[in-house]
């Protein structure tokens, strides 16, 4: 049976990571791959939805002359419009990526890549997020200035993806992070989220009118607990596969109820 795949990202519709993943999925599987992605860079937007402004869909050509749909909104907007306007049905899979830079730790809640995957799951699709480690942080938002090799990562993702085609999907979203030097022989490790992937730093600068402005920045955390996604990617150089759920309720809800229900 032909798979229906909605392919989205947060780096924008002309990202080479998106194109590489589309080409591998289209050529290696019996699948209709529909690309619906943001017109502009949307990194760090999380799962935001555009409630207060209209959205436009523009049919466009990718660099390989294939067709895609550019949306003037967020990655989650792309999922909603992709399902309800372009496809007019829920696809088998929503796949978000390949992102330029890894998405690790609990900070995934800020990721547009993960936001789109969660949105896809929310509407009933099986969902993957795929990200490629980029150790040169200054290149993460300058893809056009320095070529980043995505084909290897796309083929590694294929190896992971095909394992879940003939089995019940185990979670809401599978978060796949791929080391920048990964090959098809790189071990795949099932991981949990680390606490943090970056330190938090605020840099103050002064504009020509002597007013302060700020950049939120940070530095990669290298030391995390073994078994976490950060440790797998940055220390062991393994492919990290983290099963995620939309339900963020505390795990020990019964204990919480026992302790606090008498207070209300």
Curated annotation (Swiss-Prot):
InterPro entries documented for this protein: SurE, SurE-like_Pase/nucleotidase, SurE-like_sf
Gene3D superfamilies referenced in this protein's UniProt entry, alphabetically: Survival protein SurE-like phosphatase/nucleotidase
Cofactor info, note text: Binds 1 divalent metal cation per subunit.
Keywords: Cytoplasm, Hydrolase, Metal-binding, Nucleotide-binding
Chief localisation class: cytoplasm
Gene Ontology CC annotation, any one: cytoplasm
UniProt subcellular location: Cytoplasm
Amino acids binding a divalent metal cation: 10-11, 43, 99
GO MF annotations in UniProt: 5'-nucleotidase activity; metal ion binding; nucleotide binding
Enzyme class: hydrolase
Annotated catalysed reactions: a ribonucleoside 5'-phosphate + H2O = a ribonucleoside + phosphate
EC assignment: 3.1.3.5
Family annotation (NCBIfam families): PRK00346.2-1 (NF001491), surE (TIGR00087)
Family: Belongs to the SurE nucleotidase family.
Function: Nucleotidase that shows phosphatase activity on nucleoside 5'-monophosphates.
Protein name as annotated: 5'-nucleotidase SurE
Upper taxonomic lineage: Archaea, Methanobacteriati, Methanobacteriota, Methanomada group, Methanococci
């Amino acid at each position: 049976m032909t798979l229906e795949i909605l392919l989205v990202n947060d780096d924008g519709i002309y990202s080479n990571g998106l194109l590489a993943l589309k080409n591998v999925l289209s050529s290696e599987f019996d699948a209709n791959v529909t690309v619906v992605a943001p017109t502009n860079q949307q990194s760090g937007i999380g799962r935001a939805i555009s409630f207060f402004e209209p959205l436009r869909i523009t049919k466009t050509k990718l660099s390989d002359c294939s067709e895609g749909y550019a949306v003037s909104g967020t990655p989650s907007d792309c999922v909603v419009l992709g399902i309800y306007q372009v496809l007019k049905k829920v696809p088998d899979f929503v796949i978000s990526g390949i992102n330029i830079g890894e998405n690790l730790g609990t900070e995934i809640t800020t990721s547009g890549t993960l936001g789109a995957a969660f949105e896809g799951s929310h509407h009933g699709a099986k969902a993957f997020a795929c990200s490629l480690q980029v150790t040169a942080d200054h290149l993460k938002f300058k893809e056009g200035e320095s070529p980043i090799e995505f084909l290897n990562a796309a083929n590694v993702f294929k190896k992971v993806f095909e394992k879940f085609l003939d089995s019940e999907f185990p979670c809401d979203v599978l978060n796949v992070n791929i080391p920048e030097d990964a090959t098809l022989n790189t071990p795949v490790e099932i991981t949990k989220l680390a606490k943090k992937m970056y330190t938090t730093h605020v840099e103050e600068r002064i504009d020509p009118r002597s007013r302060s402005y700020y950049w939120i920045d940070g530095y990669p955390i290298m030391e995390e607990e073994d078994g976490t996604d950060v440790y797998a990617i940055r220390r062991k150089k393994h492919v990290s596969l983290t099963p995620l759920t939309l339900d963020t309720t505390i795990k020990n809800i019964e204990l919480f109820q026992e302790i606090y229900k008498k207070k209300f």
